[in-house]
Amino acid sequence: MGMRMMFTVFLLVVLATTVVSFTSDRASDGRKAAASDLITLTIKGCCSDPPCIANNPDLCGRRR
C-alpha cells in the first residue's frame, strides 16, 4: 500500500470512530435525562405524602 492509500484508510478509521462516539454520547444523554425525570417524579411523589415528608425532610426542602 502506498502512503496516500494508508493516509486515506487512517482518515476513514478516524471518521468512523468519531461518528460512533458521537452517536453513543447522544444516546447516553437521553438515558440520563430519563433517569433524572424519574428521580424528580419520585421526589415530588414523596413531597406530597406526609409520612414520606416526615421521614425525608431534606428531599422536600424542609429541615427537622
Curated annotation (Swiss-Prot):
Pfam families in the record: Toxin_8
Subcellular location: Secreted
Residues cleaved off as propeptide: 22-43
Keywords: Amidation, Disulfide bond, Secreted, Signal, Toxin
Positions carrying Cysteine amide: C60
Keyword Metal-binding among UniProt keywords: no
Tissues and organs where the protein is expressed, per its UniProt entry: Expressed by the venom duct.
Disulfide bonds listed in the record: C46-C52, C47-C60
Signal sequence region: 1-21
Keyword Disulfide bond: yes
GO CC list: extracellular region
InterPro entries hit by this protein: Conotoxin_a-typ
UniProt-recorded Gene Ontology molecular function terms: acetylcholine receptor inhibitor activity; toxin activity
Domains: entry comment: The cysteine framework is I (CC-C-C). Alpha4/7 pattern.
UniProt similarity note: Belongs to the conotoxin A superfamily.
Role description: May act as a toxin.
Additional information: Negative results: does not show activity on alpha-3/beta-2 (CHRNA3/CHRNB2), alpha-7 (CHRNA7), alpha-9/alpha-10 (CHRNA9/CHRNA10), alpha-3/beta-4 (CHRNA3/CHRNB4), alpha-4/beta-2 (CHRNA4/CHRNB2) and alpha-4/beta-4 (CHRNA4/CHRNB4) acetylcholine receptors. Does not show inhibition on high-voltage activated (HVA) calcium channels currents that are mediated by GABA-B receptors.
Protein name: Conotoxin Vc1.3
Lineage, opening ranks: Eukaryota, Metazoa, Spiralia, Lophotrochozoa, Mollusca
